[in-house]
Amino acid sequence: MTRCLDQIKLTLLFALIALALILRAQPSPAAGTETLTVAGGCFWCVEADFESVPGVIEAVSGYTGGTTPNPTYSQVTSGGTGHYEAVQITFDPARVSRETLLNLFFRSVDPTDAGGQFCDRGDSYRTAIFVSDTGEKALAERSKAEAQRALGQAIVTPVLSLGAFYPAEAYHQDYYKGKKLVFTRFGPKRQLNAYKAYRKACGRDARVRQLWGNAAPFAGS
């Protein structure tokens, strides 16, 4: 009997440790703010797009949707973790609504592509919206249906339950405005210039403009 009780206590201890790790991985939003977590291909681009939106406080690049705890960029892009490259957006709902952000999201990606985004192929680059409750799910599904009607094509972006969100390595945060010198296939460049060269070469904005036309919020001209 004592051995059984000890085993139960040990099992409960492991369960509590696992729960603590999951909660630790979730950034705590500031009072009066909300979060929206989306996957839209390269997280550098999604982060850059949404940090330009008035009412967005910050956007953090990271990984979610998979089973591997505390994954690295190399693990995620190599496959097998189940994680998406994702961005967690913290926003002030008094300044910008969740619905507005969802509408911007759909019009900033190719939601018809089930195999990745633009030049980035593979499961980790697929699109997705992650939700925490039934209200968020209903709103995301409604936004998806509206975007599908507007586009006139089937949208394959799933609406998934949000699990642990793991912030990506510091190197990836705010990459689009970084000043460090990096070596790329375009030669040595500052991060912000390497980002611009990558985004153009990947064809992100060209494809989004092709799909959404003037409704594309971040694609420029």
Functional labels for PLM-detected ranges:
Residues 2-5, 13, 21-221:
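Flexible coil/turn and secondary-structure edge motifs
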